[in-house]
A protein has these predicted regions:
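Extended beta-strand solenoid/passenger and fiber regions
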Residues: 1-70, 86-102
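Surface-exposed, short loops/turns at beta-strand junctions within beta-sandwich domains
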Residues: 70-77
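Beta-propeller and closely related beta-pinwheel folds
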Residues: 92-167
Length: 167
């Protein structure tokens, strides 16, 4: 999953090896927020590991180095290391937060996503939320509709399809 426009936290999972101590996250630099790591146990539960005790964080590089390698997964083929960190991107929340128009819409008449537009800084762009999740707005979940000098003014549903109205 991509970064959430509304929340800087993200979680990545890894399939550990017997000797790997350093794990590179997809995003950097990281915020000063505490980084958490969890290690999969043989019973399927997750054991919390502590920053500063079990691992160190290079926030500039977006990498963790473990004192002891997390090792191989106790469950064949299943990721055994879960890391949660945060990376704030200035202006991300405003991309949807400054929108002025929206509608519920989904395929086949389901109302399972929110579509938003009307942000004066992104006049011809519309964003859509995660499936049945109005709290998740992936940073790449948007469409650019037509020319930038023609703003999206609203939405309607016509014959089961989402229509976008521009000025």
């Amino acid at each position: 999953e991509g970064l959430n426009l509304l929340n800087p936290s993200f979680t990545e999972q890894f399939l550990g090896t017997a000797d790997a101590k350093r794990y590179q996250l997809s995003f950097a630099p990281l915020d000063d927020t505490a980084v958490t790591a969890e290690l999969l146990q043989s019973d399927g539960s997750w054991k919390a590991l502590a920053e500063g005790t079990d691992f160190s964080v290079d926030r500039t590089a977006g990498a963790l180095t473990f004192v002891t390698p997390p090792g191989e997964s106790p469950l064949d083929g299943q990721d055994n290391l879960k890391i949660t960190a945060a990376r704030t991107v200035e202006g991300y929340a405003d991309r949807v937060g400054r929108c002025r128009v929206g509608i519920l819409y989904g395929v086949g008449g389901a109302s399972d996503r929110i579509f938003l537009s009307g942000n004066p800084d992104y006049r011809n762009r519309d964003w859509y939320s995660g499936y049945n999740d109005p709290t998740y707005w992936e940073d790449s979940a948007y469409s650019v509709l037509g020319r930038g000098d023609s703003a999206i003014m609203g939405y309607s549903i016509l014959a089961g399809r989402l229509a976008t109205h521009k000025d």
